[in-house]
UniProtKB/Swiss-Prot annotation:
It is found in: Plastid, Chloroplast. GO terms for biological process: guanosine tetraphosphate metabolic process. It comes from Oryza sativa subsp. japonica. The gene is RSH3. Pfam families: HD_4, RelA_SpoT. Residues 1-50, 109-134 are annotated as: Disordered. This is Probable GTP diphosphokinase RSH3, chloroplastic.
Amino acid sequence: MSLPAISLYTSPPPGAVYSSEFDPSSRGSSPPCSTAPPSTSHRPPAAAGGLSCLFSSPAAAASPPRAPPHDELGALWQDRSDEPAFAGGGGGYSSSPLKWRDLHHHHHHSPVSVFQGPSSSPAASRSPPASWLAGRDRDRERLFAGFVRNALGSCVDYAPALSPRSEVGGGELAFELDENLAEASPACEPCARELLAGAQARHRIFHEELVVKTFFEAEKAHRGQTRASGDPYLQHCVETAVLLANIGANSTVVSAGLLHDTIDDSFIDYDHIFHMFGAGVADLVEGVSKLSHLSKLARDNNTASRIVEADRLHTMLLAMADARAVLIKLADRVHNMKTLEALPLGKQQRFAKETMEIFVPLANRLGIASWKDQLENLCFKHLNPEEHKDLSSKLTKSFDEVLITSAVDKLDRGLRDAGLSYHNLSGRHKSLYSIHNKMLKKNLTMDEIHDIHGLRLVFEKEEDCYRALDVVHELWPQVPGRFKDYISRPKLNGYRSLHTVVMSENVHPFEVQIRTKEMHLQAEYGFAAHWRYKEGTCRHSFVLQMVEWARWVLTWQCEAMNKERPASLGDSDAIRPPCPFPMHSEDCPYSYTRQCDHDGPIFVILLEHDKMSVQEFQANSTVMNLMDRVGTNTPRWSPYRIPMKEDLRPKVNHEPISDLNRKLSMGDVVELTPALPHESLPNYREEIQRMYDRGGFALATRGGSSRR
């Protein structure tokens, strides 16, 4: 089956999002499936990046069908609604004439190899071929048709709204897929086969034996389950897995994405997954289940409204679990956020607030810009609908197509004249929420923001970035004070790039970003892209990635300090972390020390009297330390007071314990329940209160007599 080409930088495919965190009562029987065939109007990105060894996967294929999502705890079901207009797929207005057939025979078929394309040389410039230039005017209308819509969403670059394959241009990658779908497949509903076929058309990894096997297991587990919208629950599982595939996840992670809700929402348990698919998949699914449980507790207790506890929570989520489980949880939430319209307004806002306070920081710390932008824009829409609508309208009116196209042409000529060969030159735009946030923080109008639209230039080598910067400043006058060198001074999450603002011929400022391929992968896909890119240079990259991950978790304190620092003190970028991921500062004391053991503060979830809190303890703290703190902080006159630790029956991660010297670990859930039966508590508490009152009165009387 031959499919249309996709643009290299297209952002993750749009799709309905479903969350298991929603209303359990909306579970129902699934009607006859009405899954639509895969759409060709949006294209997923070429999957680039991924955890080394763990995150290597085939390249992305063609376009995705729209589907629903699932987010948190398994028993929750949510409607799928029409996808928000701003959440559409984006892509790159690319001048890079790469062909899939050139990459297909490359030795390494990882997402990164797709991104790299054929090797470049000065003699073979990446400039647009003559045929592309000749047809540019013809394609310009479709090329920019979806720009403003994409700008309102989470896309990173401009993407042509591709129609049938006859319109494939020279700057795109043509993908040829086999027509073979899953071979021997168990009995399942017709709609499930349609979902599998759609996933296989969107990404090759869904042809792999393990992924096909887990797909049918997920279908069996969720058979008959529907979301409030009436869509099959399985559709959310598929969309979550597709999101993971598009950032370079391997078959183990994609399989866990398909099964991520089975422990919570079906008859399947850890042992079943372990025996069917091995420890790798089972451990990830169990990890996601625990993360979902913590997220549900946080939502029920409105943890997002308490800044300190919210910061502790997303730090804990990063540190406690396999990073891949956190990625699956994030993909789950991205998909769920796209279908909030089906929920009551109050639930929409509560869910969006939790996403903004907990999951956006998670995506930011992982460095996955495309997911972070999607989540921010969706939260902005639900939390500030009027501001969102107004800013969307202004952005539509301010879009200047002529400025972008003329700037691309001018820079392309200048780079060729300077003998510089680039990997990709594309238009880019700032996300809607980023514009809104910048206007608030710096008290600016939309006209005063200079980086709403701009260009992005990607090179093979770092030195070419600085040479290209000189070319840019020769072509356009530089706006004073607007140059930032994030290559020599990376951001907290490892972001590296050169940013400069220049003035166009019509005296309109625009931004130019210059980076290498490695920097681009890091910016778009975070830590996974970095390790995947480096995999070929180190035989022990799995060990290195774990060390780098442990080091990076240490920077949470710097991020918290940035958050609390008054805006009046200046740019928050002035505060630098000791270890900007994934490198170390030269003077960092941890550069050559072992980082695998966690010796910093630990965060645990405390459940007491049906209330949840996120508590911070020193390393090596025990359950006894926690109970001492609870006893100290509980007022004696509280009707819920249980005065002696011996009267409490602690549970850690739902298991009763007898050894109070057990050490606490990051992410433990500690429940303190009374040892007495629940029905005896009122009388017990009243008697203890009377005893205390009588004893306290007698003590005060004796003390007063002795003083006289």
